[in-house]
Curated annotation (Swiss-Prot):
The keyword Lyase does not apply. The keyword Zinc does not apply. It comes from the Bacteria. Homotetramer. Pathway: Glycan biosynthesis; glycogen biosynthesis. This is Glucose-1-phosphate adenylyltransferase. Keywords: ATP-binding, Carbohydrate metabolism, Glycogen biosynthesis, Glycogen metabolism, Nucleotide-binding, Nucleotidyltransferase, Transferase. Its EC number is 2.7.7.27. SUPFAM superfamilies: Nucleotide-diphospho-sugar transferases, Trimeric LpxA-like enzymes. Belongs to the bacterial/plant glucose-1-phosphate adenylyltransferase family. Pfam families: Hexapep_GlmU, NTP_transferase.
Amino acid sequence: MRSPRVLGLVLAGGAGKRLAPLTADRAKPAVPFGGIYRLVDFVLSNLVNGGYLRIAVLTQYKSHSLDRHITTTWRMSNLLGNYVTPVPAQQRLGPQWFAGSADAIHQSLNLVHDEAPDVVVVFGADHVYRMDPRQMVAQHLETGAGVTVAGLRVPRSEGSAFGVIRTADDGVTIAEFLEKPADPPGLPGSPDEIFASMGNYVFTTDVLIDALRADAADPESVHDMGGSIVPMLVEQGTAAVYDFAANQVPGALERDHGYWRDVGTLDSYFDAHMDLCALDPVFNLYNRDWPIYTNVPPSVPPAKFVHDTPGRVGVATDSIVSNGVIISGGAVRRSVLSPGVRVNSWSVVENAVVMDNSVIGRRAVVRDAILDKNVVVPPGATVGVDKEHDRARGYQVSEAGVTVVGKGVTIAD
């Protein structure tokens, strides 16, 4: 029996408004993460590690940096017809942009027809996690479902923040798909948990095509995969759930098994970075059996730490320090530094995410903050120390008190 022919479609058109100002000049999937990665690298690494090597990334909003990252990083050998390619909105069906995630795929059905897959894997582009998609595809084929939805077990008390899956008594068939219900139903045998939709789907190809065409013809539809297509197939009795907790990733540790983060807000984005900095991180970037791939410029030199005199020590603890960083007599604690960052003498960077080529001046303090690329913190200046002062200077402060500074800003007094 031959292996199924699989096409990967990655939904990467999100604007990510809740991540502003980090999305002022880039699409959400292009937002940097973890020092050297982009958010889109996680889903693409999962698909490629799983052996799914024909992938179209559907883009739309401010996609230049995302398109450039994909074309420079994800270059597959085309000897066997493999590819990872960005596909911008092309207005194939008329002079309009994508009206939703389902419309994005409907307008790109030529890709499906050209590839003629048995199965279409439709994954989102802006979550941090590891997953072996082969196991989800195997269950999909075994059950004969039209669509299989990846479900994440979360406490029932948090169900109002998610699309919630109610299963039939068999625990697999989806009986109902509820969008952010006030009183979500618990799981059979585990009433204090619910299945939250992860936004990852596996479709039988002809079922997907028929559903997209029916949805496109419905003027009342919101043309969304979770809001339109999945409920349609639930009603037809052909939808199943895949329990993400059952997914076994090669090389995964017990503590990071089942890790999944939606980093759609500034606070969740910040918290996911802090997850990386722990002594025993709940998400392990160093799994060699299931690597997260990205583009690291070969010309960037290693990190450098200088000065070791009383009161002036270049040091970083509980932190991720990327290539090209120079910590020159400053102290870095529980932070993530991207390539090219410079931390100068007597400065302190604590509980912070500092992106490429930002400069922290002498005796400056950066605390509980996110700095986008090319930010300059002048000598003696502070960021994140006085939240009211940060707001007065025009910097965004999140609900949890994280100060966020946009790209290319020089911090004002």
